[in-house]
């Protein structure tokens, strides 16, 4: 099975997250995409102190109508800081025969050298970097950490960066939905509409639970 992996705080999950997952699923012929909410993100504080359980429930509501999507609570169960390398190793142990595709945003990929054991990620899975409009796979190569750049070679026929492990880095371009969780939180705090930015079921959950009313 070809398994996509999309992590994040999902605070809250929104339509751009879903569209990115769907485009990756379609373009790279993924059988499933698993959404993995972070319990304790290591690189930034969790705004609003929203519980893991609430964020997990919003993701479950968001993906309920898509049979190609699934949700995992593994980072909440594991506890501690939610390092990607630990999650990927756990997934690989659970799915030893599956091909993993780790979906990350361009900003995160640009900072990947700051991640825990970042070099080991490429030996565990393929990486799909969601690029800003107009970016290319060659520009992606330019931000590879110097320490591991020699492990990759550009494959023009497949338009990807091949890693010596047999995995590859792909550039997913053209996802044009400019939606952010921080903007949604501000809209809720200001009493404004968030319709069409998030799934209806998630909007209803936010209203019922009075989430983000005092968000900063």
UniProtKB/Swiss-Prot annotation:
SUPFAM superfamilies, sorted: Nucleotidylyl transferase
Pathway(s) where this gene product acts: Cofactor biosynthesis; NAD(+) biosynthesis; deamido-NAD(+) from nicotinate D-ribonucleotide: step 1/1
InterPro entries found in the cross-reference section: Cyt_trans-like, NadD/NMNAT, Rossmann-like_a/b/a_fold
Domain of life: Bacteria
EC number: 2.7.7.18
Gene Ontology MF terms in the entry: ATP binding; nicotinate-nucleotide adenylyltransferase activity
Family, per entry: Belongs to the NadD family.
UniProt-listed NCBIfam families: cyt_tran_rel, nicotinate (nicotinamide) nucleotide adenylyltransferase, PRK00071.1-3
Role noted for this protein: Catalyzes the reversible adenylation of nicotinate mononucleotide (NaMN) to nicotinic acid adenine dinucleotide (NaAD).
Protein name, as recorded: Probable nicotinate-nucleotide adenylyltransferase
């Amino acid at each position: 099975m070809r398994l996509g992996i999309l992590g994040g705080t999902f605070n809250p999950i929104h339509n751009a997250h879903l569209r990115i997952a769907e485009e990756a699923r379609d373009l790279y012929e993924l059988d499933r995409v698993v959404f993995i909410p972070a319990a304790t993100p290591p690189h930034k504080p969790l705004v609003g102190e929203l519980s893991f359980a609430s964020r997990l429930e919003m993701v479950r509501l968001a993906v309920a109508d898509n049979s190609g999507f699934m949700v995992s609570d593994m980072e909440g169960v594991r506890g501690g800081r939610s390092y990607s390398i630990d999650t990927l190793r756990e997934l690989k142990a659970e799915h030893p025969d599956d091909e993993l595709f780790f979906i990350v945003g361009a900003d995160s990929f640009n900072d990947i050298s700051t991640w825990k054991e970042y070099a080991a990620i490429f030996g565990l899975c393929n990486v799909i970097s969601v690029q800003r409009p107009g970016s290319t796979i060659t520009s992606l190569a330019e931000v590879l950490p110097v320490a591991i750049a020699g492990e990759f070679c550009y494959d023009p026929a497949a338009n990807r960066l091949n890693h010596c492990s047999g995995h590859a880095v792909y550039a997913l371009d053209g996802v044009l939905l400019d939606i952010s969780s921080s903007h949604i939180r501000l809209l809720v705090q200001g009493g404004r509409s968030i319709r069409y930015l998030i799934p209806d079921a998630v909007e209803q959950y936010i209203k019922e639970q009075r989430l983000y009313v005092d968000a900063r």
